[in-house]
């Protein structure tokens, strides 16, 4: 290996030899010459001196040199600019009264500037033992700046003695600029020693940057005025303004070495980044107006715009290290990190406005406006690392870790508005206005993690442990609403108007989550352990609704009018969720025991809700003065829900002596419910000009409720010992519940009077209610004992309970009264009632036994009972009454009635017992 001191000594020796040779050569060549030299001898003209060709310079072979050094550099600065300008002017004053004026101006120019700074340097040194050192470095820095501008203006006017005038104007701007820069550099060292060892190092970077901008505008206007008072104007304007910035950077470093002992090292590193940002705005507007001699006119305006801005960035960093040693050991390490982000905002729109005035009072005006807005904000990150070590005796270790995360938010919104108003020659006024808005949104988040640790020791024992997790959620939304109104008003006072309003919305939410942990161990003695446990869950939710409102109103001739409204609404929400948990183990211990154990749980749930309503109304008056009013209303809602869960716990244990035990426990639960209700009402009222009227109304309501639930469980156990004796036990149970309730009611009323004096009053009502409940339970226990000598003992116990209950109620009635102008009348009164209820219970149990002894003796027993009970009854009653009068003091009356009763009371008990002995 070449030392720095050796390099310095070698360099001095080389310079000393060259310097001594030059002195000897000069002494030999100029010993007899005068010491006076002309000034032209050292001039820069490049011409040969009077001494001829001078020294004969020797040519050296660089491949055989002990040292070679070369360098170069370049620096430059360039700048330029330019501009131009043109003007024009014209004025004419004519004898005939015509005047003309023209003016124009045009300017443009540019500026450019560039700079450069470059340098390279390389050195190579050889030692006598064959060692070589190479070094080098370079850099390059440059910049470019350029800009340009342009301006153009012109104007023209014309006028004559009749009053006619014309004019036009233009204005244009065009400005551009660019700025860019570069900075890069590299440096290296390469050392190769005679003994085969080496060292290499290389570093570098590169940075770029660029800016762009522009400003463009184009305007023109034209105007004309006629001698008759007419005019016509046109204006146009459009332009664009924007800038952008782009930048990037890149840096790296690489290192590698080998020492005399054979140890090798390497290291690599890089870092990159980039960004882009900017904004841009485009716009355009147009205006035209026209005025005629007859007083008619027109004005039209339109425009649009589009604005955008953005900001984006990326970054990355990577590192790796590796060591390989001569003794076989090694280590490795690497890491990575990266990110990206993006932001975008944009807005655009269009607009128009048109007005017109026609003959005979005709007018119209219309407008339209639309907008569109968008936004995005997104970012993601990730990072990870890994490392590994290898030891002398087969030991190894590994470590990993990583994480990822990100988010995203996005939205879009739109609006629109339109109007139209007009007046026709008859004086009719029409109007139509509408507006709407809608939008969507998105919001997301996620992350993910991972970790791993693994190792092997010198005895071959292995361990592996990992943890993983993830999460994600997502939200979405959307909405829309609109309004519209239209009307017509006539000169005779008649009119009509309509209004409509509507809105909707919907939102969703989703989420997921999971976690997992694993542990694995395997040892050289045959023992092991495998364990995994974790959980996962998800949830989904949705909600939304809509509303609608409509109204109309009109007025006709002769007092005729009408008014109607409709309103409806709907709303809903749903949800469902699920989750799971587990823990699994498989293990073998040093004493030969093997264990298998699994636990699993699961839960699910879902629900849904809904509501709706509808309301209407109507009122009207006809030409005769008859009036009518109607209203109706409806409403309904519902609810549904279900849920379920399950659990399992299973375990098996095996021992080295062949004894074994097994257990298995499980349970399942379910539940559901449903509820719904509804209401409805109607009312109609009529009032006639002749004094007759009618009033009719009705109402109804309903309710329902249903519930169900179950619970199922089982416990099982078994064991066998080393001698062959076994015992087992199983337990089962079941519980069920069911209920159903309902209610319904209704009523109606009528009140009317006719022209001849007849009057009617009528009322009805009805109520119905029911209820039903069912419950049940089952239980069972089974046991068995078996001995190695053949003895067996068995038992079986069963029991059950049932319960049922029901109820019903009914109530209905009807009353009516009819009277006439002659004094006669009729009355009706009817009614009905019913009530019933019934309840029943039952229970039972059974015990069974069996025994067989080793000497052959057998015996059995069977004992049980059953109980049942029923209790309840019903009662019903009704009546009817009528009364008729003739208005002269005579009447007829009828009465009917009925009533019934029933009662139930039952009980039963049954028992049995059987014993058998052999």
From Swiss-Prot:
UniProt biased composition (Low complexity): 79-89, 270-281, 430-441, 632-647
Composition bias type Basic and acidic residues, residue spans: 103-127, 515-533, 648-660, 673-688, 738-765, 800-814, 830-846, 883-918
Region (Disordered): 66-150, 226-283, 326-481, 515-548, 594-707, 737-774, 800-918
Domain of life assignment: Eukaryota
Compositionally biased spans, kind Polar residues: 326-354, 363-372, 379-404, 534-545, 604-619, 661-672, 689-702
Protein name as annotated: Uncharacterized protein F59B2.12
Organism: Caenorhabditis elegans
